Amino acid sequence: MDINITLIGQMITFAIFVGFTMKFVWPPLRKALDERREKIAEGLASADRASRELEVAKRQSAEILREAKAKATEIVENAYVRAHKVDEQAKEEAIAAADKIKSMAMAEIEQEKVKAKEELKHEVVSLAMAAASKIISANVDEQSSKKILKDFVEKV
């Protein structure tokens, strides 16, 4: 093996080249690779975070939708109950008003009935008095009395 000056010169030049590359070229290259690695890691972490946030948002939106449906159902049921109560109340009020009108009509009928009885009583009394006075005033026999009473009964 012949080692000559050229080979030594090439070795020295190669060593200087390696030293120069290690000192000036490798650090910026390494820095660029590290930055690229960090950006990729951040992108993956961000995508993972976004995926988790999306799942949370989906669950929250599903929960909100479920609550909204439950609330809507409750509102509809409350409206139905309220409408039913209003309907029942209106029916009860109508029945009460009808009962009141009926009782007032019955009371009025009863008053008219009492009034008619009183008028009839007064008329019967006056007719009886008239018949009695005719019987007394007329010196009549039994047949005449019967005829007067028969006429009186027909009038009544």
From Swiss-Prot:
Keywords: ATP synthesis, Cell inner membrane, Cell membrane, CF(0), Hydrogen ion transport, Ion transport, Membrane, Transmembrane, Transmembrane helix, Transport
Subcellular location: Cell inner membrane
Membrane topology: Single-pass membrane protein
CDD domains named among the record's database cross-references: ATP-synt_Fo_b (cd06503)
Signal peptide: none
GO MF annotations, alphabetized: proton-transporting ATP synthase activity, rotational mechanism; proton-transporting ATPase activity, rotational mechanism
The keyword Transmembrane helix belongs to this UniProt entry's keyword annotation: yes
A family per Pfam: ATP-synt_B
Transmembrane residue ranges: 5-27
GO CC terms, sorted: plasma membrane; proton-transporting ATP synthase complex
Chief place of localization: membrane
Subunit structure: F-type ATPases have 2 components, F(1) - the catalytic core - and F(0) - the membrane proton channel. F(1) has five subunits: alpha(3), beta(3), gamma(1), delta(1), epsilon(1). F(0) has three main subunits: a(1), b(2) and c(10-14). The alpha and beta chains form an alternating ring which encloses part of the gamma chain. F(1) is attached to F(0) by a central stalk formed by the gamma and epsilon chains, while a peripheral stalk is formed by the delta and b chains.
Free-text function comment from the UniProt entry: F(1)F(0) ATP synthase produces ATP from ADP in the presence of a proton or sodium gradient. F-type ATPases consist of two structural domains, F(1) containing the extramembraneous catalytic core and F(0) containing the membrane proton channel, linked together by a central stalk and a peripheral stalk. During catalysis, ATP synthesis in the catalytic domain of F(1) is coupled via a rotary mechanism of the central stalk subunits to proton translocation. Component of the F(0) channel, it forms part of the peripheral stalk, linking F(1) to F(0).
Family per record: Belongs to the ATPase B chain family.
Name of this protein: ATP synthase subunit b
Organism the protein comes from: Francisella philomiragia subsp. philomiragia (strain ATCC 25017 / CCUG 19701 / FSC 153 / O#319-036)
Gene this protein is translated from: atpF
